[in-house]
């Protein structure tokens, strides 16, 4: 069975990535992408994200390009397509290929139902910052990720504990940016990536959820006012 990692490895090979090259990847991601880059002998270079889409920021990629850059891997995060148009402008200026990665092949009906559920939540949730799709982007909502305003990770974690106590399963989608993980430990400041790790929370969203289950999520969140007393 061909895995997403296998597919990316093949794409890097087709793009001509060789040992000693650099490949720009998001740090707001699982470590697998960076490890695939290492597996072909190249060096992952981490760039920041757009705070709305959680996908690679074209401006950050622009600053990360060097004469060793051989490719950019644009991960489609949580089902939101990366901005391949803006990244394409960077690609043309520097003659560096951009490889889209991470969109899952799913039944159209399941995606449509998730989008309808996401619309329901977005219209009713209060006090949290709900996800927004870029204009013309088709968000697949593989995860429904909100931001908990306040004092970063302490407030996000307290909010999550309070939701779980009310029977709502939720989780931080990413705890540690890849550039700060034990495998890499890069001395690099990626402000939006780090802020997203501290503020973001994935709420339940599945194609087979009922309206009653969705309303339970809304009621639990809104009962907290969307924001707990900021942590000390």
Language-model segments: residues:
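PLP-dependent aminotransferase class I/II
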Residues: 59, 71-75, 84-86, 93, ...
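Conserved sugar-transfer catalytic core signal across GT-A, GT-B, and GT-C glycosyltransferases
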Residues: 7, 11, 33, 159
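Short secondary-structure capping/turn micro-motifs that flank functional sites
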Residues: 7, 53-54, 81, 178-180
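PLP-dependent aminotransferase-like
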Residues: 17-77, 81-100
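ANL superfamily AMP-binding
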Residues: 5-22
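Conserved N-terminal alpha-helix of the aminotransferase class I/II PLP-enzyme fold
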Residues: 1-8, 28
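Conserved Walker B
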Residues: 103
């Amino acid at each position: 069975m061909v895995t997403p990692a296998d597919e990316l490895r093949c794409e890097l090979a087709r793009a001509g990535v060789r040992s000693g090259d650099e490949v720009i990847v998001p740090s707001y991601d699982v470590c697998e992408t960076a490890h695939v880059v290492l597996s072909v002998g190249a060096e992952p270079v981490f760039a920041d994200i757009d705070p709305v889409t959680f996908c690679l920021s074209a401006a950050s990629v622009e600053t990360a390009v060097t004469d060793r850059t051989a490719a950019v891997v644009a991960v489609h995060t949580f089902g939101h397509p990366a901005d391949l148009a803006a990244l394409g402008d960077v690609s043309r200026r520097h003659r560096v290929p951009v490889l889209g990665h991470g969109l899952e092949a799913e039944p159209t009906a399941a995606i449509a139902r998730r989008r309808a559920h996401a619309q329901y939540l977005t219209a009713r949730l209060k006090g949290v910052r709900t996800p927004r799709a870029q204009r013309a982007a088709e968000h697949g909502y593989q995860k429904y990720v909100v931001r908990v305003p306040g004092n970063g990770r302490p407030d996000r974690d307290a909010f999550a504990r309070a939701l779980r106590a009310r029977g709502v399963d939720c989780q931080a989608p990413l705890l540690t940016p890849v550039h700060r993980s034990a495998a890499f430990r890069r001395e690099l400041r990626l402000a939006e990536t780090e802020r997203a790790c501290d503020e973001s929370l994935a709420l339940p969203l599945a194609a087979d959820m009922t309206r009653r289950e969705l309303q339970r999520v809304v009621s639990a969140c809104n009962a907290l006012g969307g924001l707990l007393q900021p942590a000390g």
